């Protein structure tokens, strides 16, 4: 319930990825300008292996696992041994869906895998407000006033058992 979340988010630059997740959990979102950017609901992983570099340098680099931990770092070993990215992509897909579901709940919109929002796109402030990804344009003062107004409403409701 929006009245339980008496927190406002104020965007004065870029609110992307995890910041978007956190920011949209507020009761109200304000954005300073059409030049601000929000979105980037996506997930990625960067992979680097230095094994060949170490080998060329004469360094014997080994990862040794006990037989009882055969699934430890399975995804990484699948890339290194077989150039197979699928295990990591499967894990990333699960985490991406968790991210999308959280954004869907925060914004009160249905998850649609075809929607650019859920595919990682960044939006300018005007597009974000028009699509309902941000509540309104405003200043930091507007955000503070909103929080104070919510606290006042809550207090009045408590006083009169509303």
Question: How does the language model describe each region?
Answer:
Residues 1-36, 41-162:
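N-terminal organellar transit peptides
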